[in-house]
């Protein structure tokens, strides 16, 4: 069975993971974290009184991992459906991993809001995609449905958050589970 890496570009934990790991031996699977929460009844800690502590913990992990400081987008967390649909467009063009890595750098190393079209455009350009074509494709009903279907399939497999690495029946969730600190 192929190893699968489930992700959403709005997650700083995904940023921590892809910034330090090659992940070139896995199938990248874009899903909607918000969609997972809707299915499971969960929600983001970033919208609770744990926000500041959670952000500080992520910043400390980035420093511990030797990564550049996190630059939080002003509107984080936001609505990343457009960015996640753009991931599906990138997959159709064979540049999903490159697009996702660029989007995550734009969001968490440059502090740009991935819920805004211009940030997605920059990720598309850096990945060799035509941003106008990407913008047109992300509005397609079949692409919207595909993201819903991929998210449902991930949920059915037991995925409850991102990042998650599925290796056969084994699910590793979180940057620290996928590559435990030594």
Q: What are these model-derived regions, one by one?
A:
Residues 3-24, 105-182:
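C-terminal cap of thioredoxin/glutaredoxin-like
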Residues 9-107:
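Structural alpha/beta surface segment adjacent to cysteine/selenocysteine redox centers
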């Amino acid at each position: 069975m192929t190893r699968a890496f489930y992700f959403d570009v709005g997650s700083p934990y995904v940023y921590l993971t892809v910034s330090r790991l090659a992940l070139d031996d896995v199938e990248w699977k874009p899903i909607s974290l918000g969609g997972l929460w809707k299915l499971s009844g969960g929600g983001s800690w970033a919208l609770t009184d744990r926000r500041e502590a959670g952000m500080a913990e992520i910043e400390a992990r980035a420093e511990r991992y030797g990564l550049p400081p996190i630059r939080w987008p002003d509107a984080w967390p936001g609505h990343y459906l457009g960015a996640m649909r753009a991931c599906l467009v990138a997959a159709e063009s064979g540049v999903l991993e490159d697009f996702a890595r660029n989007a995550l750098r734009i969001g968490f190393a440059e502090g740009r809001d991935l819920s805004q079209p211009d940030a997605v455009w920059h990720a598309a350009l850096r990945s060799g995609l035509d941003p106008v074509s990407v913008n047109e494709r992300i509005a397609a009903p079949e692409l919207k449905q595909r993201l819903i279907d991929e998210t449902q399939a991930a949920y059915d497999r037991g995925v409850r958050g991102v990042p998650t690495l599925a290796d056969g029946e084994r699910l590793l969730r979180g940057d620290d589970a996928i590559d435990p600190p030594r």
